[in-house]
Amino acid sequence: MEKKESLDSSLKEIVSVCKRRGFVYPGSEIYGGLSNTFDYGPYGVELLQNLKQLWWKFFVHLREDVVGLDSSILLNPKVWEASGHVSNFTDPLIDCKNCKTRIRADKFLEDQKGEGFATGLTLEKMNQVIKENNFSCPNCGQRGTFTEARDFNLMFKTSHGASAEDSLDIYLRPETAQGIFLNFKNVVSTTRRKIPFGIAQIGKSFRNEIMARQFVFRTREFEQMEMEFFCEPGTQKEWFSHWVNYCMNWLTEQVGVKKENLRIREHEKEELSFYSEGTSDIEFKYNFGWGELWGIASRTDYDLNQHQKFSGEDLKYQDQVQNKKYVPFVVEPALGVNRLFLAVVTDAYQEEKLPDGEIRTVLRFSPKIAPVKVAVFPLMKKDGLLEKSREIFADLSKLGNIEYDDSGAIGKRYRRQDEIGTPFCITVDYDTLKDDTVTVRERDSMAQERVSVTRLRNWLFERL
């Protein structure tokens, strides 16, 4: 039986509302689960779709200099040799000899000695610190039972082929970026794009994390929204600055994340990825502390040069204006969809005490990303209120995901929608049958307003 991973206490309220209201479920739950796997429920998948569509709108559709791509998860294994992932995509691993628990050494040391302590430490130095401090195992409590730290490759390996004789060892991709680099030449040829331009995609990636934890923040299966922006060498710093600012503005102005919950952190030289000349993270203040949300990296010409070398293909760009050929430099904004999901739920979550002493839990999502835009309630299930409510519901469905609910007391229906994050609730009552108006209740202020049915859709459209 696989060990259950303990839940960070700071996340319990977030996890509770996500499970209770159908945002996130434990994976394979009826079979006892599988650690660090999650399924997104009806409201979770709506929130994810809204976030992805909003990203695609502002990073592809509203830009003349970016196009889209959907590359394969399974790639020729030579791709990962060329990219450096086979030899360099590792984390330091230690084992407890007593209970067999596997631990990521650098994160363990930072838990013991403070954030940033392990930055730049070699395996030898990590081993020295662990021995000198005689740390106890966080699982069994025994001291002095750790193995020597060693590199652990994070890529999932599988077989490609129907029989052992002709099967090929391949990997599930650990990032979506390489599929973009492989198609750089195809995109230039078929779209006639001129540098500077970007290629964006949304897709699943897989990393065999040693310590997958903190709910959906660090999972072995995750989704990325990545873009590789190709530019002329010497202009990458200007574009790097552009994308850091563009990404930050998108989070605050479009998604609605509070500015005080975001910060930009520049990587130290010792913590840079093997392909990067400079990286800045947009970090979010999660319940467990600051964590990477969005990484913007200057990947130079590393990837295209490596694929030229290993494949034999000429991946240089022919600049017709300057009449010269060069390998473009690349700036990469890479955003984890699951981390963004956790960030917006955390940012929106609030508990407030009402005048009657009741505690109200509410998710204050921006209307742009709210999984349900409007909920329609008949006050009673009789006297024509159901029919009128259904008529209004059908008319409003053109605005997006609209929910209909005729079960339970109105107050409880309001509370349920508060926890889902629905911006507006509409109650159809007996006055509706008299004067064709409804009560519209706003989520954050709980203020109520009578609005005529004839102008209801436009009234909501202006606010969603």
Curated annotation (Swiss-Prot):
GO terms for molecular function: ATP binding; glycine-tRNA ligase activity; protein dimerization activity. It is an enzyme of class 6 (ligase). The keyword ATP-binding applies. GO terms for biological process: glycyl-tRNA aminoacylation. InterPro entries: aa-tRNA-synt_IIb, aa-tRNA-synth_II, aa-tRNA-synth_II/BPL/LPL, Anticodon-bd, Anticodon-bd_dom_sf, Gly-tRNA_synthase/POLG2, Gly_tRNA_ligase_bac, GlyRS-like_core. Keywords: Aminoacyl-tRNA synthetase, ATP-binding, Cytoplasm, Ligase, Nucleotide-binding, Protein biosynthesis. Its EC number is 6.1.1.14. Transmembrane segments: none annotated. It is found in: Cytoplasm. It comes from the Bacteria. The keyword Protein biosynthesis applies. ATP binds at residues 207-209, 217-222, 292-293, 336-339. It catalyses: tRNA(Gly) + glycine + ATP = glycyl-tRNA(Gly) + AMP + diphosphate. Substrate binds at residues 104, 175, 222-226, 332-336. Belongs to the class-II aminoacyl-tRNA synthetase family. NCBIfam families: glyS_dimeric, PRK04173.1. This is Glycine--tRNA ligase. It comes from Leptospira borgpetersenii serovar Hardjo-bovis (strain JB197). The gene is glyQS.
